[in-house]
Amino acid sequence: MFDTPAVFARITEAAAEAADNAALRGAVVAILRDVQNAGRAAIAEGFAEDPFAARPLTRAYTYLTDGMVKTAMYVASEILHPLATPTQGERIAVLAVGGFGRGEMAPFSDVDLLFLTPYKITAWAESVIESMLYILWDLRLKVGHSSRTVKDCIRLGRDDFTIRTAMLEHRFLAGHAPLARSLDQRLKSELYKDTQREFIEAKLEERDARHRKQGERYMVEPNVKEGKGGLRDLQSLYWIAKYIYEVKETAELVPLGLFTPSEYRTFVQAEEFLWAVRAHLHLVTGRATEQLTFDLQVEVAARMGYQDRAGRRGVEVFMQKYFREATRVGELTRIFLTKLEAAHMKGAPLLERIFRRRRRIKQGYKVVRGRLDVVDPEAFLADKLNLLRIFEEALRTGMLIHPDAMRLVTANLDLIDDGMRNDKEARRIFLDLLLKHGNPERALRRMNELGVLSAFVPEFEPIVAMMQFNMYHSYTVDEHTIQTIVNLAQIEKGELVESLPLASSILKAGVNRKVLYVALLLHDIGKGRPEDHSILGARIARKVAPRLGLSKADCETVEWLVRYHLLMSDMAQKRDISDPRTVRDFAKAVQTTKRLDLLTVLTVCDIRGVGPNTWNNWKATLLRALHAETKRALEMGMEALNREGRGNEAKKALRTALSDWPAGEVKTEIARHYPPYWQGFNVETHVTFAEMLRQLEHSGDPGGIEIRLDPDEDRDATRACFAMADHPGIFSRMAGALALVGANVVDARSYTTKDGYVTDAFWIQDAEGHPYEAARLPRLSQMILKTLKGEVVARDALKSRDKIKKREKAFNVPTHITFDNEGSDIYTIIEVDTRDRPGLLYDLARALAAANVYIANAVIATYGEQVVDSFYVKDMFGLKYHSEAKQRTLETKLRKAITEGAERAAAS
């Protein structure tokens, strides 16, 4: 790896031939680069053969880097700047600090060096350090360095915990060894002594700040080094242990009683896995990359040997392993800190600094440093129901469970058997955890982390730490499930009345809470298998719900909710809910207002539980409208959806709104529109189009174009209204104009008039998913107008915009195209499910226009990198596409448009 005698021999030879110091330094760099490249290649080759063997890799990189640093020091101090008789002040010691000092080097880790001098730095020492650094920089090493005296180290370490931590792991490399020993002694006697609590508090605050910045361990693009449950958390444990106990290896924590042998094995397993992932990240990217982004997850999973299997991609199996290891790191942290508290700390507990009002605890429990612990482990385990009761007691008292009690529970999960799962009292306790205390997520999350939830509901185990490899879901499946229950509990407590008025009013009026909570717990339990997760989940729910003690009627409702938990979301986001047929079909599926209310609340909780930014006013508006229309149909009968009756109501509302218009003009305006127009828009939009059409007629310009851009706050979007003379392909031209200005279309409706005009409304958002700022609207309007007038050709101008971001290329999004002639009385619905990209709607609309397809509406639903565009269409004769041959022809054209666009995007 690094043959020191051979390297020194080559350097001696080069020194004899070098004309000057600059030439010698160049020769040394060339020699070391050869060794570096050969060493890196050998390490990478060995790691590829054994992709989980992180320890040999980190040690090998440390050894290789040690060799280069020591050689650079030798060359700088003995050849480039030799001193025949150095004075007492002309001494220097080179120390590795931080991760390098610990001997843990990833392929592109920083090389942190401390140049230690006895007194103020001399000119000779400065020259040596400078020459050393130039050699290391020329080797493309990322060197972090500082030059200090021993006194400086003590002074700076007192005020800066980052410096103190780095020095905690110093390791002598080269130079004057007695100087390094002096630092070691003085750090212990002057800096570390009697400051343990201060150091621990600082490390915990640092950890909390890091976690706040990086997010939960369940976030699906975790930072392997800095994220929650990552390497830095494990390193923090080691730093604290070293600071207090002066340990050199983690194994020494076992005889000290801080870890059991089993916990130590867990530590080693987690550390080895996380280091392997980090090393692969560095090798894949060729730099110090710590964020496990989607594109890198695929590559790292492949390098580590994870393969696709039925229903799941290899990358999903890999990430499930990652999240499970991150969870174990969290458990180890809790155990370690609690042991430290018991042995060393006074005052408030380290894990829980919040004052809590004490409640009397039940017999068999005790309070240890503010946490709930077990008095007698044997007596506790004698009644296996205590493995559930402890979570109930923790919720009742508001206390955290002591890690010793957690250890006891985890070590005895085998007590949770079929007998216990079918025990009436066990069912009662479990349902009370969900329903009784107002914060079920606290119990569920801890039960999940300790394995109790999967032991009591074994069907839950496959989704624990399961990642869904897409950009839509921000959490693992189990954490998403818990987030949905958090949402329901918050709505129940009245905390979301303003943001979720409909769901809040439904719960206030009263629903079957037990059914809702159990349905949410089970709604995604079928994920990760080849079968549709809703169908499989319903079958699983049919087994689990009775076991949890639900009545036959409640079991049927839970099963129905799990089977159709996506129905309302799909109807609202993928279909035109102003079409009576959509509401009629949905009402037939739901059948009762009771089920409608339950499904509405479940849908809201589910969407909000997907991630921080998935819920918005647009989705809220769609769901509220679908709920209102469906409820009306269920209560008043399907005739309430009569198109003619609803049209008359809309016309009456417009007459009232245009009361200041001459009667003749109002009559003309109402007469010019076909029936679907009246249900497609609200009265405000009808007024806008009336004014725009009036303006067009008054202008006398046959090529006139009217554009209105207005904020639609209810929908978190900007409404873009267009009115002009109708001609073929107008919808695709407008879609192109909007794509060109970078607008994301979230909904679109197009209606022709009897007198030759077209009225189109597009709801658009900016690249961040927000309505456009008012100040941008005039400029936006001008740019759109230029495109519509042909001054800019959208097809050509869009070529440079068709780009897919690197991290999105990892996703495999197959294209599915379906034709639905039952979902609308008037139109064929073409549903295109494919990868989203800029300009996709325009490409699809242009392909349909070229095939003489009339597009009435386009409903757009986006799920991260995936989009579902639903087009309501007729042929040129106003008929549906019933012919399978015509459907196949259209599908071919649409697939061609998608493929060509994807190729453009990949090439750009």
UniProtKB/Swiss-Prot annotation:
Question: How is the activity of this protein regulated?
Answer: Uridylyltransferase (UTase) activity is inhibited by glutamine, while glutamine activates uridylyl-removing (UR) activity.
What UniProt keywords are attached to this protein's entry?
A: Hydrolase, Magnesium, Multifunctional enzyme, Nucleotidyltransferase, Repeat, Transferase
Q: What is its EC number?
A: 2.7.7.59, 3.1.4.-
* GO biological processes: regulation of nitrogen utilization
Q: Which InterPro entries match?
A: ACT-like_dom_sf, ACT_dom, HD/PDEase_dom, HD_domain, NT_sf, PII_UdlTrfase/GS_AdlTrfase, UTase/UR
HAMAP family on file: PII_uridylyl_transf
Enumerate the PANTHER family for this protein.
BIFUNCTIONAL URIDYLYLTRANSFERASE/URIDYLYL-REMOVING ENZYME (PTHR47320), BIFUNCTIONAL URIDYLYLTRANSFERASE_URIDYLYL-REMOVING ENZYME (PTHR47320:SF1)
Q: What is this protein called?
A: Bifunctional uridylyltransferase/uridylyl-removing enzyme
By which gene is this protein encoded? glnD
